């Protein structure tokens, strides 16, 4: 049978999602816990391979197993064998043609900036601290130039392995909740470091170092060297993955927990 799981994790102490030799990853910890429940080796496939330090509230994985277990066992049993910073949120049986990555139609990320002169001791790895005052309205206005299908070479990591820089951004919103600025972006898919590179350049606009139209110009140049530095991994969350309704994938609160859902 094939099982899909919803996964939440604090990526602060992991070297990203993907299993690697000699370092700890989220995938490694999850597979170890699932293998205990299944009493057999389990390999998982995820919707999005997040980088070192990046978090997830809406990650989706699937795996195949011959072990017959109640769905609640894949949740409670796995959680009992996971470290405190990784948790299974739900489990469903899915059809054989479901794939956590290839069946996805969109992914959604939130980047959380703590915009205050002094840093906070609470959630130091859960938000990105930026001490200069930022104009979130200008950041939002600039972000609208990125909507639609475009070549995102200006916001693509140099070592990106994707065959094409073209992506379709469905939604980009920048809002302020007290001292928190939230950059909320959804697209069909993302090139490597795309969200963090976009945020880095939006911060330049928010600080007043660049005009709103600079983002439009950057997009047209298709040159990563002209854009701002990559924003820190802290503060980035994979919050949702969209699938066709026929797969029956549950919808849950986006998070992270300290933000109101939308």
UniProtKB/Swiss-Prot annotation:
Binding site residues for substrate: 109
EC number of this enzyme: 5.4.99.12
Pfam families associated with the record: PseudoU_synth_1
GO biological process, one term: tRNA pseudouridine synthesis
Membrane-spanning intervals of the chain: none
Disulfide bridges in this chain: none
Protein known as: tRNA pseudouridine synthase A
Lineage of source species: Bacteria, Pseudomonadati, Pseudomonadota, Gammaproteobacteria, Pasteurellales
Gene: truA
